[in-house]
């Protein structure tokens, strides 16, 4: 599959197409909200077919991605408008999903403000100097649009290429970013994070407020450049019980989501958050992402009225025999139909050993093929 070569000079977009001007009012594509199944489902409508996309659809599951990324560090690929554009488009060509998701990483805005973070293969983000006190907090300056010029450039290039396919922007939620910063990397128990949360609540809330500002600024660049929806990833929120989530986390996620109320649909997703679904919806999401542990009809009941749901096929179901996989896909769709709106997805990201052809088959099954 050919690589898209993007001329990143001012006034030029992929394939010589001039990108649309910056600014949210000009970037929204006329009529898309009324016709795109993904956006209609986010608004709690029931389009003719269930829309589908896959978390981590742009990434290492695709051989063309691995070829493009050969010799290129993850963070470097996230800071190059040409690579962002090509990687975002690769799964759109492969699977014909109902939405594309902007290729990036949740630590990109933290690196952009000067933090020393590396993404280590097989581990994940590793923070050179963990943030555990007021001195560390002081190092977290505000994110400015000029810190991430490649983001707006890539969004504009993508809008010129995607046609009627909506583009989802994304960012990491304050709690998940805080956990990486406090722990110094991924953690099984989030012990340091919870210790700071319980023992120094003033510092904790100051840290999450700062991260909420950074996340909001990162999403603002994407929304103003023209993304059609956004997803707030709170990967580690499932480490908390509901009371702690509501007290220490939800207000900060709510502030991020509130910044985009009425502009674009807002999706809120976390892993192992079955007991937090109502609180995550109340934080201001239009769509609540659900992992595979809770059936979607039960998830919709927990979340309550006024929300669509997204999910939630077990990512390992793609390794099942086809009749088993097809039955599971149909079950997810049937349960999702009980919600006010349903966007089909996996219950977490695509596993790297997944056969891309199976994902294409899942998309066909969801669409009624």
Swiss-Prot record:
For this chain's UniProt record, which GO biological process terms are given? protoporphyrinogen IX biosynthetic process
GO CC terms, sorted: cytosol
Residues recorded as binding substrate, renumbered to this chain, are: 56-60, 105, 180, 235, 348
Keywords carried by this UniProt record: Cytoplasm, Decarboxylase, Lyase, Porphyrin biosynthesis
Record GO terms (molecular function): uroporphyrinogen decarboxylase activity
Q: Where is this site: Transition state stabilizer?
A: 105
* Signal peptide limits: none
Catalytic activity of the protein = uroporphyrinogen III + 4 H(+) = coproporphyrinogen III + 4 CO2
* Region annotated Disordered, chain positions: 1-26
Q: So, what pathway does this thing act in?
A: Porphyrin-containing compound metabolism; protoporphyrin-IX biosynthesis; coproporphyrinogen-III from 5-aminolevulinate: step 4/4
What are the subcellular locations of this protein? Cytoplasm
Q: E.C. number, please?
A: 4.1.1.37
Top-level taxon in the UniProt lineage: Bacteria
Q: Which InterPro entries match?
A: UROD/MetE-like_sf, Uroporphyrinogen_deCO2ase_HemE, Uroporphyrinogen_deCOase
Oligomeric state and interaction partners are given as:
Homodimer.
Function noted in UniProt: Catalyzes the decarboxylation of four acetate groups of uroporphyrinogen-III to yield coproporphyrinogen-III.
Similarity section: Belongs to the uroporphyrinogen decarboxylase family.
According to UniProt, the name of this protein is Uroporphyrinogen decarboxylase
- Please name the source species: Frankia casuarinae (strain DSM 45818 / CECT 9043 / HFP020203 / CcI3)
């Amino acid at each position: 599959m050919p690589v898209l070569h993007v001329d990143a000079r001012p006034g030029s977009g992929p394939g010589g197409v001039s990108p649309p001007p910056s600014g949210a009012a000009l970037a929204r594509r006329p009529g898309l909200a009324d016709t795109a199944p993904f956006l209609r489902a986010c608004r709690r409508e029931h389009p003719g077919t269930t829309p589908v996309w896959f978390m981590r659809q742009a990434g290492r599951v695709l051989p063309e991605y691995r070829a493009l990324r050969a010799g290129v560090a993850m963070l470097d690929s996230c800071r190059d408008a040409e690579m962002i554009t090509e990687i975002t488009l690769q799964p759109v060509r492969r699977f014909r999903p109902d939405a594309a998701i902007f290729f990036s990483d949740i630590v990109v805005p933290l690196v952009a403000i000067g933090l020393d973070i590396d993404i280590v293969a097989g581990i994940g983000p590793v923070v050179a100097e963990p943030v555990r006190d007021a001195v560390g907090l002081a190092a977290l300056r505000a994110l400015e649009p000029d810190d991430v010029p490649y983001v707006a450039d890539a969004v504009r290039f993508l809008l010129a290429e995607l046609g009627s396919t909506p583009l989802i922007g994304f960012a990491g939620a304050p709690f998940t970013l805080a956990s990486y910063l406090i722990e110094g990397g991924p953690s099984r128990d989030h012990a340091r994070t919870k210790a700071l949360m319980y023992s120094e609540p003033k510092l904790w809330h100051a840290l999450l407020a700062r991260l909420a500002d950074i996340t909001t600024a990162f999403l603002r660049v994407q929304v103003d450049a023209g993304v059609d929806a956004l997803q707030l990833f709170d990967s580690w929120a499932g480490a908390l019980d509901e009371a702690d989530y509501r007290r220490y986390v939800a207000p900060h996620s709510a502030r991020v989501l509130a910044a985009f109320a009425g502009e674009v649909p807002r999706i809120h997703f976390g892993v192992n958050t079955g007991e937090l679904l109502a609180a995550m919806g109340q934080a201001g999401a239009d769509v609540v992402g659900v992992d595979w542990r809770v059936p979607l009809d039960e998830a919709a009941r927990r979340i309550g009225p006024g929300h669509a749901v997204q999910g939630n096929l077990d990512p390992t179901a793609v390794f099942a025999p086809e009749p088993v996989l097809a039955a599971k896909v149909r079950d997810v769709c049937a349960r999702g139909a009980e919600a006010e709106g349903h966007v089909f997805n996996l219950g977490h990201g695509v596993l790297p050993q997944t056969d891309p052809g199976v994902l294409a088959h899942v998309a066909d099954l969801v669409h009624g093929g």
